[in-house]
């Protein structure tokens, strides 16, 4: 990993952690969304992938942090007829109503 990519990775990580802190402790969702948006821009410009665990906590519609009970609601969907062994979890953003579906194993 080059020095430039390490710097970009550290910047994205810092912005994500700062947005979490602002959202949970200071109750500043607007600034938190701005930091998430900036982190996504930095990762796209440097062609760097964001870890899937971090992606799962960000709304694609409005860049809000998805915190169960505060900014999103979680529902468990019925198993499909094609794959009855896979349970699905539905995360719904309370700000923009964007829906994210995950298999239960990935959450």
Curated annotation (Swiss-Prot):
Domain of life: Eukaryota
Top enzyme category: hydrolase
Biological process, per Gene Ontology: tRNA processing
An annotated GO cellular component: cytosol
Cofactor, how bound (note): Binds 1 zinc ion per subunit.
Keywords: Cytoplasm, Hydrolase, Metal-binding, Nucleus, tRNA processing, Zinc
InterPro entries, sorted: Rpr2/Snm1/Rpp21 (IPR007175)
Stored Pfam families: Rpr2
Molecular function terms, GO-annotated: metal ion binding; ribonuclease P activity
Localization, UniProt: Cytoplasm; Nucleus
Cofactor: Zn(2+)
Gene3D superfamilies documented for this protein: 6.20.50.20
Residues that hold Zn(2+) according to the record: 59, 62, 93, 96
Reactions catalysed: Endonucleolytic cleavage of RNA, removing 5'-extranucleotides from tRNA precursor
EC numbers for this chain: 3.1.26.5
Summary of the function given for this chain in its UniProt record: Component of ribonuclease P, a protein complex that generates mature tRNA molecules by cleaving their 5'-ends.
Recorded family membership: Belongs to the eukaryotic/archaeal RNase P protein component 4 family.
PANTHER family hit by this protein: RIBONUCLEASE P PROTEIN SUBUNIT P21, RIBONUCLEASE P SUBUNIT P21
Name assigned to this protein: Ribonuclease P protein subunit rpr2
Species annotation: Schizosaccharomyces pombe (strain 972 / ATCC 24843) (Fission yeast)
């Amino acid at each position: 990993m080059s020095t430039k990519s390490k710097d970009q990775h550290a910047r994205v990580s810092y912005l994500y952690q700062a947005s979490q802190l602002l959202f949970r402790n200071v109750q500043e969702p607007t600034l938190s969304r701005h930091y998430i948006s900036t982190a996504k821009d930095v990762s796209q410009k440097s062609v760097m992938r964001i870890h899937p665990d971090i992606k799962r906590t960000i709304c694609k519609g409005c860049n809000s942090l998805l915190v169960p009970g505060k900014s999103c609601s979680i529902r468990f969907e019925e198993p499909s007829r094609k794959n009855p062994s896979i349970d699905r979890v539905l995360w719904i953003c309370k700000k923009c109503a964007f829906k994210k579906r995950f298999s239960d194993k990935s959450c």
